Curated annotation (Swiss-Prot):
InterPro entries: 6-PGluconate_DH-like_C_sf, 6PGD_dom2, G3P_DH_NAD-dep, G3P_DH_NAD-dep_C, G3P_DH_NAD-dep_N, NAD(P)-bd_dom_sf. Catalyzes the reduction of the glycolytic intermediate dihydroxyacetone phosphate (DHAP) to sn-glycerol 3-phosphate (G3P), the key precursor for phospholipid synthesis. This is Glycerol-3-phosphate dehydrogenase [NAD(P)+]. The lineage of its organism: Bacteria, Bacillati, Bacillota, Clostridia, Eubacteriales. Its EC number is 1.1.1.94. Belongs to the NAD-dependent glycerol-3-phosphate dehydrogenase family. GO terms for molecular function: glycerol-3-phosphate dehydrogenase [NAD(P)+] activity; NAD binding. GO terms for biological process: carbohydrate metabolic process; glycerol-3-phosphate biosynthetic process; glycerol-3-phosphate catabolic process; glycerophospholipid metabolic process; phospholipid biosynthetic process. One of its GO terms (cellular component) is cytosol. It catalyses: sn-glycerol 3-phosphate + NAD(+) = dihydroxyacetone phosphate + NADH + H(+); sn-glycerol 3-phosphate + NADP(+) = dihydroxyacetone phosphate + NADPH + H(+).
Length: 332
């Protein structure tokens, strides 16, 4: 048994499916939305999430999740963070122990405050779990734009195996043994990207964006180290790299949602306008509660929480951030 199955037919999963099909892998996509599956099989494109790319004929879309789960050695969980536990429960009865589970979502489980790999391992405890993360917008991956990411696992032999599967001439994959740092960086950067987008929407300039990104990185490091991550991980691809691309790219849905909020929309209105999951919203709620319980300073996250969930005024929150007591830049 070989090949790669994607549980979820969103933009990033579809982009990776295209890339792997070009490499010669047999690829299967399952999604609960049958219109997506029909488009893939008949039009050879994902009209909803990645409409400008042709999907190779060796990619099959199926509506039978049992068939999809049994088809391949590598099972990629390509669904939003809130759906991870649900899809694990759907496929757990169909898996064999030699199948490797690959998580590509970025976030935390809101109710339990657990990292997504922890959630996967709880449900699929017989299977090895690998996390793939990094600065990798779907629109660029699908078009073979040079991209670098990281794979990590609690057992690095599985990360190295997945590294071999996903490596191409345009998609370079590094290994990193710090699974905690990799996942925390990928989750918290969405919070900072939302804040950065709000600054853009208000009309602030490059100075503000630079401040949000660098001070945001301090918040990522503080909470990440507190949760067990290594400081150096946050200066790598899944920390600084992912933060840069998410805060600056025209493809970033978190930044785009932030822009709309900065221009006067409510959080709900902005998310509805984007039409896809904005992971930074749930992440902000999760990490606001985490930093409160752990006693970690995260002022940008706190201000964003007030804007998203307490109808705070974005400009007032920026003023409050700027008016805080003076500090050393490197307080930890």
């Amino acid at each position: 048994m070989g090949g790669v199955t994607f549980i979820g037919g969103g933009s990033f999963g579809t982009a990776l499916a295209i890339m792997l099909a070009k490499k010669g892998h047999n690829v299967v996509i399952w999604d609960r939305n049958k219109e997506i599956l029909e488009d893939i099989n008949t039009l050879r494109t994902n009209t909803r999430y990645l409409p400008n790319n042709i999907i190779p004929c060796c990619v099959k879309a199926v509506d039978d999740i049992e068939k999809a789960a049994k088809e391949s050695k590598y099972i990629v969980l390509a669904v939003p963070s809130f759906a991870i536990r649900e899809v694990c429960r759907k496929i757990k009865g169909f898996l064999r122990e030699d199948q490797i589970i690959i998580s590509i979502a970025k976030g935390m489980e809101e109710e339990t405050k657990k990292r997504l790999s922890e959630v996967v391992k709880e449900e699929l405890y017989k299977n090895p779990v690998v996390v793939l993360s990094g600065p990798s917008h779907a629109e660029e991956v699908a078009n073979d734009i040079p991209t670098t990411v990281v794979v990590t696992s609690t057992d690095m032999k599985y990360a190295e195996e997945v590294q071999d599967v996903f490596m191409t001439n345009s998609f370079r994959v590094y290994t990193n043994s710090d699974i905690v740092g990799v996942e925390i960086g990928g989750a918290v950067k969405n919070i900072i990207a939302l804040a950065s987008g709000i600054g853009d929407g208000i009309g602030y300039g490059d100075n503000t964006k630079a401040a949000l990104m660098t001070r945001g990185m301090s918040e990522i490091m503080r909470i990440g180290v507190k949760l067990g991550g290594k400081p150096e991980t946050f200066f790598g691809l899944t920390g600084m790299g992912d933060l840069i691309v998410t805060c600056t790219s025209m493809h970033s849905r978190n930044r785009k949602a932030g822009i709309l909020i900065g221009r006067g929309m409510s959080c709900r209105e902005a998310c509805d306008k984007i039409g896809m999951v904005v992971e930074g919203v749930k992440a902000c709620h999760t990490f606001y509660e985490l930093k409160e319980s752990l006693g970690v300073s995260m002022p940008i996250t706190t201000s964003l929480y007030k804007v998203l969930f307490e109808n705070g005024d974005p400009k007032k929150e920026v003023y409050e951030l700027m008016a805080r007591d003076k500090k050393n830049e490197y307080y930890f």
